UniProtKB/Swiss-Prot annotation:
Residues 206-220, 234-259 have a biased composition (Basic and acidic residues). It comes from the Eukaryota. The keyword Nucleotidyltransferase does not apply. Disulfide bonds: none annotated. InterPro entries: p53-like_TF_DNA-bd_sf, T-box_DNA-bd, T-box_sf, TF_T-box, TF_T-box_CS. SUPFAM superfamilies: p53-like transcription factors (SSF49417). CDD domains: T-box_VegT-like. Residues 36-209 bind DNA. Keywords: Developmental protein, DNA-binding, Nucleus, Transcription, Transcription regulation. This is T-box-containing protein TBX6L. Residues 203-259, 280-323 are annotated as: Disordered. It comes from Gallus gallus. It is found in: Nucleus.
Length: 361
């Protein structure tokens, strides 16, 4: 039987002659803080994602060896879904809640030191502490965009290239660790994870005593204002509340005055009776006249055609109306226009000119 030759191209086929003495298989990567990652992994690691972006804890930190000391490399990290499910926290355990959301465009975080010689990456562990996770799909700050309640794992890419523009044609290797799998959440679901974060995260020192943020509480106590200052601050509020009470009492007095002095409508004008109750009210959009705010209601609603004639006598003309005006007024009495209304001052029949007092009922 004939054996087919291996048609797979060797890894160094795309490499330049200077890369041949150092095959890529010699690169090794180990995860730093493995013990801490294992503590979280045994319970079920959770990572907070926010709109503005949140750093990871434990942070992604790796130790690299086997690089070419004088060759330049780029260190990249991306996050891929572990499965196609969405999860929920129910009765102290994670359960499948349904199908995963459509995968978002994959973003890759580039270490800020990239590109750098291999000697630079190998002299100390490579930390991706500035990497942030977000759930903002419109993020423009380069954060990693993830769905909440989904499981992800980070992948570490080591690319031999002089710059980002030549990454596509460069040789690279990908490394991942099962201990770094996590569930993205907007708030911690497992109380044990919360406790582990507080006990091990150096930025959570304020929460370590009885699970409270003692740093914030101490700061609040140190900035507590003195009683004198507190009284001074309350004075304006007391004044404002007193002013509101006086205004409220004033409004009540106005209402009482309106009710205590109802407008008497002459029996000779029966078509006003249906409008009597609404004559005291003004539309909500228009402010009440100044005369109504200052004292009892002195206005009532009357048909518009008599407005000009009535105002004419209010101006001080004490002469008797011409006969044609009286005839026009008598003609108006025979018509009813309840919707065509305006406001004029109310006067007693004793104060009216002689031409009005002699009108027939």
């Amino acid at each position: 039987m004939q054996v087919l030759p291996d048609i797979k191209a060797p890894c160094d086929a795309l490499a330049s002659p200077s890369l041949e003495p150092y095959p890529q298989s010699s690169i090794t990567v180990t995860l730093e803080d493995m013990g801490l990652w294992m503590k979280f992994h045994q319970i079920g690691t959770e990572m907070i994602i926010t709109k503005s972006g949140r750093r990871m804890f434990p942070q992604c930190k790796i130790k690299v060896s086997g690089l070419i000391p004088y060759a330049k490399y780029l260190m990249l990290v991306d996050f891929v879904p572990v499965d196609n499910f969405r999860y929920k926290w129910n009765k102290d355990q994670w359960e499948v809640a349904g199908k995963a959301e459509p995968q978002l465009p994959c973003r890759t975080y580039v270490h800020p030191d990239s590109p750098a010689p291999g000697s630079h990456w190998m002299k100390e562990p490579v930390s991706f502490q500035k990497l942030k996770l977000t759930n903002n799909t419109l993020d423009q700050h380069g954060h990693i965009i993830l769905h909440s309640m989904h499981r992800y794992k980070p992948r570490f890419h080591i690319v031999q290239a002089d710059d980002l523009f030549s990454v596509r044609w460069s040789i690279f290797q990908v490394f991942s660790f099962p201990e770094t799998v996590f569930t993205s959440v907007t708030a911690y679901q497992n109380e044990q994870i919360t406790k582990l974060k507080i006990d091990n995260n150096p930025f959570a020192k304020g929460f370590r005593e009885h699970g409270k943020n003692t740093r914030r509480e101490g700061r609040a106590k140190s900035q507590k204002p003195s009683p004198a200052k507190g009284q001074k601050r309350k004075l304006p509020e007391e004044k404002e509340s007193g002013a509101e009470e006086r205004d409220f009492e004033k409004d009540e007095n106005v209402d009482v005055k309106e009710e205590s002095n109802p407008i008497v409508v002459s029996s000779g004008y029966p078509f006003w009776i249906s409008e009597q109750n609404s004559s005291h009210a003004f539309p909500a959009a228009s402010p009440a006249p100044a005369e109504q705010r200052e004292g009892p209601a002195r206005e009532q609603q009357v048909p518009t055609p008599s407005y000009q004639t009535y105002r004419f006598h209010e101006a001080g003309d004490s002469q008797q109306l011409p006969s044609r005006d009286v005839a026009a007024l008598n003609d108006f009495r025979g018509r009813c226009h309840p919707l065509d209304l305006a406001t004029v001052p109310e006067h007693d029949s004793k104060q009216l000119p002689e031409g009005f007092t002699n009108l027939p009922p």
